[in-house]
């Protein structure tokens, strides 16, 4: 069953997100430092008539990596080709993509940490020298054919920057870590989205949704979509705070943005009485895979101080005990 606060994209959300996606810097709310730096770099490249350096975006899912890439392409007046690492299985897959690029094009590779070492090897000269090296044959008779490529910009996006190999990471001229959004930023995103949907929303209602969106625009827009359903069924022209609170309660999202799975995880850590729990232990107890816990559930909890991740495992924090209304174990070294 899909969680309403899931940060990964639902299969039916692509068209909805596309409708609400900002198309320029003025529309894009948040990530101000990244925006301001990119504006300068893009302006400088256009002034010199150069292609933009390769860009790496990393951070938790749902924070706008794809949207930023689309805006970069728009600002550079460039075509953008979008793919994902799992779709590039063979060297021929990457070669086909690279040889179809034109001068100044942007290639966006999502989940770039999932590229195989063999594919990375092909990407190195393409990124550095705009050259594709194709090996024909094997053994002593093998020959390397070098094909010149047009100058292009590679934008890589990943939720797991630590899994990128050093040679690949070093070939990106710009590295940007996306941060969680503030409730105020999310409230503005929600208000703008509601306007695009021709639906009025009270400022208090937008902020209420924002506070429960785990700092993530994708979740904020999903919650807005569901709250709008409740409002429309009630024949209300405006989404009110009262309707929003009732809708979010019905959806099982509390005032912190936690759902049942979050609370189960925190309760599990609190019940450990100060003993660190390993990722595999937590995954087994929650019937979730380790990757989902590490990449999807934990980032928000870590960023907001609801759990501590140490070399020995995960531990509850004082905030965890407070929200669960439990007394912390006095032997817990955190206290």
Curated annotation (Swiss-Prot):
List the residue ranges of the region (Small ATPAse domain (RuvB-S)): 182-252
Compartments where located: Cytoplasm
Positions with a binding annotation for DNA: 309, 314
| GO BP | DNA recombination; DNA repair
Matching InterPro entries: AAA+_ATPase, AAA_lid_4, DNA_helicase_Holl-junc_RuvB, P-loop_NTPase, RuvB-like_N, RuvB_C, WH-like_DNA-bd_sf, WH_DNA-bd_sf
Tell me its EC number(s), please.
Answer: 3.6.4.-
Cite the residue spans of the region called Head domain (RuvB-H): 255-335
Keyword set, alphabetical order = ATP-binding, Cytoplasm, DNA damage, DNA recombination, DNA repair, DNA-binding, Hydrolase, Nucleotide-binding
Catalysed reaction, written as an equation: ATP + H2O = ADP + phosphate + H(+)
A single GO cellular-component term on record: Holliday junction resolvase complex
One Gene Ontology MF term: four-way junction DNA binding
For the ligand (Mg(2+)), the binding residues are 66
Assembly with partners or alone: Homohexamer. Forms an RuvA(8)-RuvB(12)-Holliday junction (HJ) complex. HJ DNA is sandwiched between 2 RuvA tetramers; dsDNA enters through RuvA and exits via RuvB. An RuvB hexamer assembles on each DNA strand where it exits the tetramer. Each RuvB hexamer is contacted by two RuvA subunits (via domain III) on 2 adjacent RuvB subunits; this complex drives branch migration. In the full resolvosome a probable DNA-RuvA(4)-RuvB(12)-RuvC(2) complex forms which resolves the HJ.
What is this protein's function per UniProt? The RuvA-RuvB-RuvC complex processes Holliday junction (HJ) DNA during genetic recombination and DNA repair, while the RuvA-RuvB complex plays an important role in the rescue of blocked DNA replication forks via replication fork reversal (RFR). RuvA specifically binds to HJ cruciform DNA, conferring on it an open structure. The RuvB hexamer acts as an ATP-dependent pump, pulling dsDNA into and through the RuvAB complex. RuvB forms 2 homohexamers on either side of HJ DNA bound by 1 or 2 RuvA tetramers; 4 subunits per hexamer contact DNA at a time.
Q: According to its UniProt record, which protein family does this protein belong to?
A: Belongs to the RuvB family.
Any domain commentary?
Has 3 domains, the large (RuvB-L) and small ATPase (RuvB-S) domains and the C-terminal head (RuvB-H) domain. The head domain binds DNA, while the ATPase domains jointly bind ATP, ADP or are empty depending on the state of the subunit in the translocation cycle. During a single DNA translocation step the structure of each domain remains the same, but their relative positions change.
What name does this protein carry? Holliday junction branch migration complex subunit RuvB
The upper taxonomy is: Bacteria, Pseudomonadati, Campylobacterota, Epsilonproteobacteria, Nautiliales
**Gene this protein is translated from:** ruvB
